[in-house]
Amino acid sequence: MAREKIIALGKKMTDRIPYKLGLEKLTESDPEYYGLECVVTDDEADVALAMDLRKPTTPEKIAKKMGKPVSYVQKIMDDLSAKGVLEYNYDTPDGSRQYVLPIFVPGAAELMNMNLEQVEKYPQIAKFFERMAFLPLTKITPMVPPGGNGIGMHVIPVEKAIPATNESVSIEHISHWLKKYEGQLGVGYCSCRNAMRLMGEGCGEMQDELCIAVGTFARYCVETGKGRYITHEEALRILKRSEENGYVHQITNIDGEDKIFAICNCALGSCFALRTSQLFPQYVRFRVSRTRR
């Protein structure tokens, strides 16, 4: 029998319009369900359901809302963060931690796959990630305006390939982001490559430390066991090795023009974001470089 709290949480976090609007019913066979059901308890689902989607909050606020002790809510939020169901950051005036209930992609699906022990134990999480990187776009892509409206990833050209005679915006340069987040760099295993490996698919890419986390997301990854800190020089070595292997640099595109949380180094045969641009022609128009001519 399906667990109703997991059904409710899957519906809350999904980007699939028919399910979000209640036009179709979420079932045990849907990825939103089986991806969460294997790792989220009913008590954890209660806390997540008390949170607003993509709106930072604190254990104190949720505890008051639920009528529960702060220590109880704090532990559950930390456990969900370790599992990858929640994110947290320190983007507050006083640098205190705030928690976020994310959407699945980009968000919880990647983070759940970055918990290597968890996804090895529950390989259905890999399939859940693959499906959630595809299914929502089958309905929403035709409605996406030029620029992407925050959906997906943004391709960054190899810096030396930008002609010196062109005026290019600073965000088109990897160096801009490394400088902006100097001292706040981390690296973790690629969730796409890991998911494809576990599904027995992809292009045989090695599972390696290729996803560079920046800002307080780097701290989140380190504190929850999903990555480690790196220096500016090590980041440059990872980027150089990626270019030598023909990988594509991509940055996150969900938080506005001058804020990112990751620099990914993607292989066409394993990256779900690059796959999307091949499957959905409309998607290409908002993945192109913003280099000014």
Language-model segments: which ranges?
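A short, conserved structural fragment
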Residues: 81-92
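Long, Pro/Ser/Thr-rich low-complexity/intrinsically disordered regulatory tracts in eukaryotic proteins
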Residues: 123-230, 252-256
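Long, low-complexity, charged/polar intrinsically disordered regions in eukaryotic proteins
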Residues: 1-33
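Short acidic, hydrophobic short linear motifs in intrinsically disordered regions
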Residues: 54-66
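Short amphipathic alpha-helical interaction segments
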Residues: 66-82
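Short, amphipathic alpha-helical interaction segments positioned at domain boundaries
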Residues: 94-135
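Short helix-coil-helix linker/hinge
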Residues: 39-45
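Ferredoxin-like iron-sulfur electron-transfer modules
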Residues: 38, 68, 99-101, 252-258, ...
